[in-house]
Curated annotation (Swiss-Prot):
Active site (record annotation): S155 (nucleophile), D320, H353
InterPro entries documented for this protein: AB_hydrolase_1, AB_hydrolase_fold, HAT_MetX-like
Coiled coil regions in record: none
Quaternary organization: Homodimer.
Protein name: Homoserine O-succinyltransferase
One GO-annotated biological process of the protein: homoserine metabolic process
GO molecular function per UniProt: homoserine O-acetyltransferase activity; homoserine O-succinyltransferase activity
Amino acid sequence: MTDTNCSVGIVAAQDAAFDIPLPLASGAALPGYQLRFETYGKLNADKSNAILICHALSGHHHVAGYYRADDKTPGWWDNMIGPGKPIDTRRFFVVGVNNLGGCHGSTGPSSVNPATGQPWGSAFPVMTVPDWVTSQARLADRLGIERWAAVIGGSLGGMQALHWSIAYPERVAHALVIASAPKLSAQNIAFNDVARQAILTDPDFCGGDFYQQGTIPRRGLRLARMLGHITYLSDDGMGEKFGRMLRSGEYRFGYDVEFEIESYLRYQGDKFSDYFDANTYLLMTKALDYFDPAAAHGGDLAAALKPAQAAFMVASFTSDWRFSPERSRETVKALIAAGKRVSYAEIESVHGHDAFLMTDQPYVDLMRAYLDRVAKEVNA
């Protein structure tokens, strides 16, 4: 039996169907679509206490709580969301949504294309962060939420929070941008391309139309996840957890798994290939690559952020080399140059990029203090 005392408890996903086409940055348009989402807590009378949680690459709408009493795995940010937690559901109404192109209930490549009666597959349009934010705004309209008390996201989710503040300035009171960046570096784009190539060159990928073939490009997904997972960890963190430990205690002088880190990465790859969609992985990494709000302003990030009205909290982690503190400081400097209100914290952690999902005490304390301020502003 799952202990839900400090949790939002048993939750259920909801679906919102939209019949109006969604124009996309690519020039394409997505016809009728569905967004899957979850909510926790209660919306107050003036609907001022709503918080939107934006997920990262492999995330989804199931942010907190459990689906069944015997469920062993809570939502991916359950350590932050719930009664008495930093994002306190006794004070806030929290919304988590699976982005379009995802594989957890919202319309994506594995969904049926109404024009063909077959899965979208390779025909599903490329999505961008602005496309997601537009769809999230439509969901907010559906829920009757005119203004978010806060939009919060880590990594790719932080990019969405940043874009919310630019695209809908009057609808965001606070934007929390965690372990993120205003655009990807060349190195990060390179990592994403290698991961995509692992999938694209898997014979079972079938050009993205593997659903009809009854295959799953597991080899490509495994390799993509293994590569990605390495970049989410830090050298010190990996050394502390695995070092050079051998599974059998001695060298076997072969090419099978010998080191514990090899076993761990293969386990992560195998697990990921069991539930994640290959086309979704491609879409999510491309959305990361394309995000660059400063591009439309001649590379001037401060100019891109000028429309924002929100107060910002930007946080980074010392051991995160995928989205380094330098990238967060770049955002902070641009916000200051644009005359915005911004708080910045660089948190000591050995957990690398994944630290935004962890519970390092300084991080928890930071989130609790900032969200307490947000709650007081809306009398929550």
